[in-house]
Structure formats: C-alpha cells, structure tokens
Curated annotation (Swiss-Prot):
Region spans: Disordered: 1-122, 171-205, 239-269, 281-333
Quaternary structure note: Binding protein for dimer of the RII-beta regulatory subunit of cAMP-dependent protein kinase (PKA) and also for the protein kinase C (PKC) and the phosphatase calcineurin (PP2B). Each enzyme is inhibited when bound to the anchoring protein. Also binds the beta2-adrenergic receptor. Part of a complex containing AKAP5, ADCY5, ADCY6 and PDE4C. Interacts with ADCY8, and enhances its phosphorylation at lipid rafts. Interacts with ORAI1 (isoform alpha) (via N-terminus) upon store depletion and in response to LTC4. Does not interact with ORAI2 and ORAI3 paralogs.
Consequence the record notes for mutating residue 129 to S: Loss of palmitoylation by ZDHHC2
Protein name, UniProt field: A-kinase anchor protein 5
GO biological process: adenylate cyclase-inhibiting G protein-coupled receptor signaling pathway; calcineurin-NFAT signaling cascade; chemical synaptic transmission; negative regulation of adenylate cyclase activity; positive regulation of calcineurin-NFAT signaling cascade; positive regulation of calcium ion import across plasma membrane; positive regulation of endosome to plasma membrane protein transport; positive regulation of long-term synaptic potentiation
Membrane topology reported for the UniProt record: Lipid-anchor
The organism's taxonomic lineage, starting at the top: Eukaryota, Metazoa, Chordata, Craniata, Vertebrata
Function summary: Multivalent scaffold protein that anchors the cAMP-dependent protein kinase/PKA to cytoskeletal and/or organelle-associated proteins, targeting the signal carried by cAMP to specific intracellular effectors. Association with the beta2-adrenergic receptor (beta2-AR) not only regulates beta2-AR signaling pathway, but also the activation by PKA by switching off the beta2-AR signaling cascade.
Organism (species): Homo sapiens
MF term (GO), any: calmodulin binding
Keyword Calcium annotated: no
Biased composition (Basic residues): 37-48
Residue ranges, annotated region (Tethers NFATC2 to CRAC channels): 410-427
Tissue: Predominantly in the cerebral cortex and the postsynaptic densities of the forebrain, and to a lesser extent in adrenal medulla, lung and anterior pituitary.
Motif segment (AKAP CaM-binding): 76-96
Amino acid sequence: METTISEIHVENKDEKRSAEGSPGAERQKEKASMLCFKRRKKAAKALKPKAGSEAADVARKCPQEAGASDQPEPTRGAWASLKRLVTRRKRSESSKQQKPLEGEMQPAINAEDADLSKKKAKSRLKIPCIKFPRGPKRSNHSKIIEDSDCSIKVQEEAEILDIQTQTPLNDQATKAKSTQDLSEGISRKDGDEVCESNVSNSTTSGEKVISVELGLDNGHSAIQTGTLILEEIETIKEKQDVQPQQASPLETSETDHQQPVLSDVPPLPAIPDQQIVEEASNSTLESAPNGKDYESTEIVAEETKPKDTELSQESDFKENGITEEKSKSEESKRMEPIAIIITDTEISEFDVTKSKNVPKQFLISAENEQVGVFANDNGFEDRTSEQYETLLIETASSLVKNAIQLSIEQLVNEMASDDNKINNLLQ
C-alpha cells in the first residue's frame, strides 16, 4: 500500500510541474479563443469581482490542503489514497479554471490601456466576428451623412440657379411678347416669314428651360451651364436693345444659332469655366456680324422646304389619281363589250361544244334555228325588242330540253353502273 501511495504522490507532482511549467502557452491559446467570444466591457467588469472571490477561495483552500499533503498518513489505507487523488484532481481543475480567468482579466486591462490603433489591429486579426458587423454600419452612417451634405449643397445650388434663371426668363418672355406683337403687325406684308419667326421664338424659350433643367441634374456641371446661360442671355439682351424693333427675324436667327452652344456644353463638365466662357463669347461675336446672311439663308430654306414638300405631295396625288382614272376607264372599256359577248355567245358555245351528251339531231336543229334567227340581222344594233324576246324564248326552251335530256342520261348511267356493281358482287 505504501508503494502505491508513493507512486501516486510522484504522479501528482509531475502533473503539478507540467501544469505550472506551461502556463504561458495555455494563456496565449485561451486569449484568442476567449477574445473571439467574450469581448465586452460589461462582461469584463462582471468577471473581475468573481475572479477575485474565486482566487481568495482557492488561496484559502490551497494552504490547508498543502499542509495536509505534507503530513504523511500511511496507515489509512486505500480509501485515503483515493480521497487524495480526488482532492488533487479538484485542485488541478480549479487551477486550470483560475488561469483562464486571469487570462481574461489581463487582456481586458491591456485593451483599456492600449491605443485605438492597437485595438483596431487586434480586432481585425483576432476578432473578425465583432469587427465586420461594426465596419459597414459606421461606413453607412458616414456615407449617409456625406450624401445628405452633398444633397443639401446641390439643392441650395439648384435653388440659387432657379432664382437666377427665372428673372431673365421672365424678362425674355416679356420681350418675346413685344416682338410677337410687332411681328403680327408686319405679318400683313410677309405672313410666312413672320409666322416662322414666332415659332422659332417659342422654341428658343422652351429649349433654354430644358437645358437649365438638365444642368441641374448633373450637379457640378449645373453651375457652369447656369453661368453660360446667364452670360449669353445678357449678350442677347444688349443686342436686342441696340437693334431696331423691325429686326425681329434677325433676333430669332441669332438665338437659333446660339442654341447649339448650350446643347454642347453639359456633356463636357471637365473643361474649366474660363475656357467655356471664352468659347461662348467668341461664338456669339462671330454669329453677330453674319446675322443677315443667316437670316436670308434661313428664310429661303424655310420657305422652300414646305413649298417643295407640298408640290411633291400634290404631284404624287395627281399622278395617283390619273393612274387610277386610267385604269378604271380601261377596265370599263374592256368589260362593257365582254359582258355583251358573254350574254350572246354562251348559249351557242354551250349548245355546240360543251353539250357532249346531247344527241346529234338536236344539235343540228339548234344550229339551224340560230342561223335562221341571226340570218336577217346584220348587227346587234338593228335588233328590236320582239327579236330579243324570241331569242330568250328559244334559248330557254333549248336549255330546258338539254337539261331534261342530260338528267335522263345521268339516271340511266347511274342505273347501269349500279347493275354492274351488283353483278360484279354476285359473280
């Protein structure tokens, strides 16, 4: 029994040494595992008093048990050795539980004392389960703040541009009305030209409004388009004040030629403001001296296009009408004599050629009758109503006779075919 007790003591000492010799590796392993699942400040605070109380209890128990183990008791036998094994196993389990608790407390203290950069690095490497859900939330919050700021700025810019563009557009509307009134007075002399100028005035105002709205959608390019529109509107106003009131078609032509600049500006926001302003001013200066030439060419083109289209349409309609009338007249000319010929010749063709089953005597008599009827008639125009009546009666009688004979022959043939079938079946 003593030998067994001594062996048991030796094994327990080795276990203690092994447990005391490798605390660092266990702590390092348990740090990573515990940090992944228990990284919370509340949990750390709650664990601190528990760990302190458990450490005090273990410290109280350890000296008592150590004193008991130092005293040799060889006389108690096997039950005493079993009890010692159980108590020492409990000690080893309690020591193992104490070490992870200390490992939990130390990283919590280190995490509180460390910098924010170290926290981020540790969280990225060791705690992905906690880091990844927090990251997108913060980014979304920041993105929402940035989007809201940008949208507020864009709205403010849009409101400023709306306020700036409404005033010149209202001025343009009043001037357009005045020019339209003048053009109505001139329309008594040149109706077509003035009507076209009025249409161009209305289209210019609509296109400018559309270009402003499109610029507001593009954000930063809205500022450039708004400034260009305002500058060009000012140049147009100055030119309108300098020119006489009778030059309304000139104004419309200039505005029409300045519109392509507006349409080309929004898709190029990368060009700086100064270059765009210089290009716009150059284009306006170049279009100003050539206004008369543009006017003449536009008026001629606008007058010739509708006239050409109308003439082409009228010529097409006339040609179609002529062809239709010709076709109708030709068809009527062809159909009129054909109808008369059909009514006159069907009977003779039927009697002579198509009536194969008619006996020869009847055909000869029919031919003789027709010859006798038409012998005295040199033409269709010389016939009278009585002759037409006789022709109708004769044709009707001949048709009836032929029909009766054909029906009788068909019946006879059918009877003969039936008899032949019966005979064939009997045979």
